[in-house]
Amino acid sequence: MKRILLEGIRFAVIAGAAVAAVYLLILVHAEQLFERDTAVSVAAAVHLQPHNAVYLDRLASWQSEDRQNLLRRSVQADPFNYDAWIRLGLIAEMQDGDNVSAEKYYRKAAEVNHMFLPKWTLTNFYFRQQRPDDFFHWTRETLAITPYASDPVFAQMWLMSQDENTLNEAIPNRPRVLLQYAWYLAGNKHFESIPHTVDRLVAAVGKDDPGKWGRDDLLAASLDRMLAGGYQAPALRVWSSLKDAGWLEEPQPDAQHPLTNGDFHVRFYRHGFDWVPLENSGTRVEQYPEAPAVRLSLYGDEAEKITLLQQYVAVTPGKRYKLTWQAQGDDLSNPSGLAWRLHPITRLKGSAGAEITSDDLLSGTPSWTFAAPYGDAFLLALEYTRPLGNTRGRGSVTLKSVAMNQQ
């Protein structure tokens, strides 16, 4: 009796192993067919494995006439197949015009998968449907986790609404997203919205290295775009945020003292409200923060009119200012051809006041009193113009300090 029982167990084990071996062969063959990736081979793989969601998904791509049915079978086999739920939603929305079913499928995808694609799919759906509340809800969800550049999301946001509070509420306190948004705003000339975004950015970054978060590139270029476009007030607010957060060493300019880093002690930031030395053939501009001083050299083969050094200054139109400087000419003839020029910039092209120019840098009193012309922003430039009747300048000037004060 015991022997018969053992033989029965042995037979069952052998039979089970044989069934498992056959099933394994079926699995291997089905995978081989699937990997051939043809309409016939994938259909054969599904025939062998009718409940394999991956195979059903792929077959749906080959058999457009039966796509919807195959995708339904796929989500029945694997309810967590978010991609199939999304594809069902697209068929319902785009092909059948059934937005109710489409929304159900998209939401199911977001329910079973909490990553980027389902959230972004719902954001796009509600944008197409022009449903602002749902759109901004899923916009926030999308931006909270997106690993990608977010410009497409920002573009849809601005098309859906221009309300600043609504837009700001949709942006999460993720430094990466906040920096991308500030750059998007600058690129699309939404300059008035940048200061609030930068406030949030510096708060979110905290004590991390500001060089990693756009101080020297994206934010710097955004400042330059704002000022070049005549948006002095928002640029001042951004500068203040960066200064208060310790991202900048330069002082905060104001109407009384509109020029910064006039003693040249801080190494040039080269953006915003700090000095920008310009590279020109035949000239050289060198800063010596330890001196401190700036040395301007002309080699005799420079252009007849060039800008050597410039800074945006926060002057107020109609107010009187006095610019003073300390400069020493080294082997440069007098007149030197060097002079300060104030360039007004306006948002409305052609409406700026006239440019105004000081006397020669090395001639007479080292000061210039002027009334600021009309403008929305102002660029102070130290320019060289070859004096009439003279050869091109050759020599250098050491500039030790520059100051500007409202009178």
Write out the residue ranges for each language-model feature.
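TPR alpha-solenoid repeat register
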Residues: Y55, A84, P118-K119, P152-V153, ...
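Canonical tetratricopeptide repeat
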Residues: R58, R87, T121-L122, Q156
